[in-house]
Amino acid sequence: KTDIYVPFNSWCCEAQWQKYDAETLNLNGMVVDGFNHQGYGLNRYCYSGKGTWSTCEYLPMGIAEDRETGETYIFQVESSGQWLIEYGSAQGGNLYLTVSGATEQEHGWYKNLKPGECFTTVPAGAAVVKGGLNPAVAALTRYRRKVRRANPDDEKLNVVFNDYMNCLMGDPTEQKEKEIIDKA
């Protein structure tokens, strides 16, 4: 009853969203419910940032669409460091979602807390809407615009030329740049 959208990402193939049914990811719980067990499995599906490139394989965000209720959940991790997104099966045929910063299992990171100390993981933004992907993305876009801090660049935007994104692959020369700057 739930579709999960996974945002694959790589060097020259950014933001490649793939749609999976939760059952395809083995998040459908147990086949027999209520017979000498609690009726859900311990399976999980997760993806995370890797190394120093936080968007190396995936974007730090996700979408879950409930086909029965018509609700769509969209979320993002608000950190350029390590992060983890985890879906799993829960009681009653439900799914759970965990969004966090670095973890010991995936990133080799942990923090020991002394009595009375606390730790806050990375922030996340989320929205729930009736409807599909377009209303969900629109809601997250409104959120991003609302939380973005004002800065002088809002009034005077400079031109930034990224030669990696414009086919020079880190080997710019004045001549190469002149040939493509006006086209960019």
Where are these regions (language model features)?
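Active-site beta-loop-alpha junctions enriched in small/polar residues
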Residues: S80, A126, Y164-N166
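Short Pro-Gly-centered flexible turn/kink motifs
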Residues: K111-K130
